[in-house]
Amino acid sequence: MIKFSIRGENIEVTEAIRDYVESKLTKIEKYFAKDQEIDARVNLKVYRERSSKVEVTIPLDSVTLRAEDVSQDMYGSIDLVVDKIERQIRKNKTKIAKKHREKVPTGQVFTTEFEAEEVDEIPEVQVVRTKNVTLKPMDVEEARLQMELLGHDFFIYTDSEDGATNILYRREDGNLGLIEAK
């Protein structure tokens, strides 16, 4: 059973939108065990230029499913995001099946009644370069400047105040995000 948490930013989540989101996401219930409770977090945003962003996050025990879409049509974005989530489920199930052949732990996340569909073969990603870095103590502003000077989308550094390892990264919207390791 899916529990929905639907939130809107710069938009009122009407009953029609809520019903549409729930009806579309309910179709993925067939992929999960009947007794499994699934939390689906849906975030709907509308921007000044009237484009909308739909984000769906479904945290599971072994994996987090997440998809987003930005377009002028919120209902179209909802459809695309649900399709992306479905593809992720199929890929995940296929990868688990390939990795464990006979002993597929599908009951942990996905229902055993669901047959893994073969998806377009994705080339295996390989680590092609290893780089050792010395983390220097600095504040966020200095890390931002270093990241921009290097032309990177992320920068790892040691926080000069608490000594924690932090990762500063550029988000898709152009802003910056900060991951603080504990």
From Swiss-Prot:
* CDD domains assigned: RaiA
Q: Where in the cell is it found?
A: Cytoplasm
Q: Name one GO cellular component term.
A: cytosolic small ribosomal subunit
Write down a Pfam family by its short name.
Ribosom_S30AE_C
Instruction: Please name the SUPFAM superfamilies in this protein's record.
Output: Ribosome binding protein Y (YfiA homologue)
In Gene Ontology terms, what is a biological process of this protein? negative regulation of translational elongation
Q: Name one GO molecular function term.
A: ribosomal small subunit binding
Entry's family note:
Belongs to the HPF/YfiA ribosome-associated protein family. Long HPF subfamily.
UniProt subunit comment: Interacts with 100S ribosomes.
Q: What is the recorded name of this protein?
A: Ribosome hibernation promotion factor
Q: Which gene encodes it?
A: hpf
